[in-house]
Amino acid sequence: MALSDHSRQLLDTLNKQRQSGFLCDCTILIGDFHFKAHRNVLASFSDYFRAYFKDSLDSIVLLDQIKVTPSGFQTLLDFIYSGNLNYDSCNLEEINLAAQHLRLEDVVATCRTKIESLVGLTKPSVTHLAPTSSSLDENEYFTSLYPREAMKVDAIEISYSQSKVKKGIKGKKSQKIKRWKRPLRSHQHVKKKSSKCQLSSPKTPAVLSLDAKELELMAADHVAKDNTCLLSFTSEIDCEIFLSQNISLETATMTQQKPAKLQQDCAMKEHCISNIADITNVCTMEGCDKELDPKYSKNKPVCNTCGKVFSEASSLRRHMRIHKGVKPYVCHLCAKAFTQCNQLKTHVRTHTGEKPYQCKKCDKGFAQKCQLVFHSRMHHGEEKPYKCDVCNLQFATSSNLKIHARKHSGEKPYVCDRCGQRFAQASTLTYHVRRHTGEKPYVCDTCGKAFAVSSSLITHARKHTGEKPYICGVCRKSFISSGELNKHFRSHTGERPFVCEVCGNSYTDVKNLKKHKLKMHKGSEEAIEMKSAENSSSSEDSTTKSPEPESLELKPSDLFLPLTLHISPDDPQMLLPVSDNRGLSSETLLRASVPSYSEPQFIFLQQMY
């Protein structure tokens, strides 16, 4: 038993798969646009694709944009997957050309039939305009119809017989052109109103009359030159006629008409000019969408979705891709898609390694111009235009200022979905999540050691290269990280910022403090019990206290690798108050000991210790 809607269901399923990119095994490239599809579907309907895929297994097919336009191919692709051919007078010709190139015979036959019917509709609607005698030669008549293509026309007075024009229009019409009756009347109505304010001149009267044969020849010539927008030809002729008349009337009656009448005529003139511009230009745009209308108005284009204002219609079209999710620019190396062409160009540089923006002071290269600007502001003393209103600190980018402002406001919009901890930066949350997952994506090429933070890998790589960029200002000793330099600097100042909350011993390095707690107190719970026992014991039992720090003095060989934290000499002293009642967790200890560090530095500190 065969299901009646089986074929329709199959087409609908294939179309949904195409739209979502599921199982698509080929990509059609037309200029900067790409279309994903299935080879077997294309080969089933198109002789061109059948022959192409028979000889080649390439997944990317390049089509000539002159023969197959993106909008025309989109219409044909929708027809192949749905069976519905959506066309109008604007895109009919480009669909026909694309179908001929791709050898879709059924579509070609349909387009030819439609074009012939449109030509038949256009000729009668033009020949019924007005069969009157002509007092103008062919050049003058053409000038009156197309004043923009002719030379400057002197101010003349135009008068014509209203009754004859009406008589020509009210002639017999076929059933096919009844729909043109309404727009023709509207144009004649405008002419009738404009004729009331004309001035008659006895010296040089100029009579405009329309010859049916000449109009028919001009219509045929117009169709031969451009088969697009055939249905707009009659409206274009009427608008041009009225425009030429209105220009003459406005010039001849400029000194006698009232201001209100002048405004009305100017409005009519602008309306006709706008209509003609729409007719001649709208067919060249993508699919004649309504989004393109702002280009032909005096107001700036505005996005109907988010209200953003643009200076040009092309900018609005690119912006609309964001709302529609259209990403026509695809990287041929990794298949990643982008909304704009410049985004694709920047992305390709990640594959090629190209860095066209060079710093003139240090010859360092960058893939983006904004990266060069940021580098110059950060490292070469250029102006940092973004200033904090609270502490007057200046920043190179607005994003850095925004992140800094959260320190004053306390805002932490990024929340860990596992433990609920909040962070001020998205990157900090990323580093934090890696503590839960154990992910360490940054791997050393030399020894294979992995790190969760990129800065840790950079510092680690200096061990292999021997680079030591941080130099002590007192003894000129160099170190591989700023954290190691600050730890060394405490040997000159005698500072011991890390204090044990159990026994009160202080250390210059948090690693030494951690080692002390593991050796002497064996965990925070035993440390709390030991501390409470010390407080309750008498002076006679003072011998039960922890051994004196002879075993706490650490040699340089006992130290671990230094921290990779940037601590300037201006940072406040990192002192931890001693609590006699309860011990502190390692996380609380680290947070209290480094109050001036950013979240990424704090996470790195926790990971290392």
Swiss-Prot record:
Organism: Xenopus laevis (African clawed frog)
Motif (Nuclear localization signal): 172-188, 257-262
Disordered: annotated segments: 528-553
Keywords: DNA-binding, Metal-binding, Nucleus, Repeat, Transcription, Transcription regulation, Zinc, Zinc-finger
Main location, first listed in the record: nucleus
Protein name: Myoneurin
GO biological process: regulation of transcription by RNA polymerase II
Zn-finger region bounds: C2H2-type: 301-323, 329-351, 357-380, 386-408, 414-436, 442-464, 470-492, 498-521
PROSITE patterns: BTB (PS50097), ZINC_FINGER_C2H2_1 (PS00028), ZINC_FINGER_C2H2_2 (PS50157)
Residues annotated as domain BTB: 24-89
Classification via Pfam families: BTB (PF00651), zf-C2H2 (PF00096)
SMART domains linked: BTB, ZnF_C2H2
Keyword Repeat applies: yes
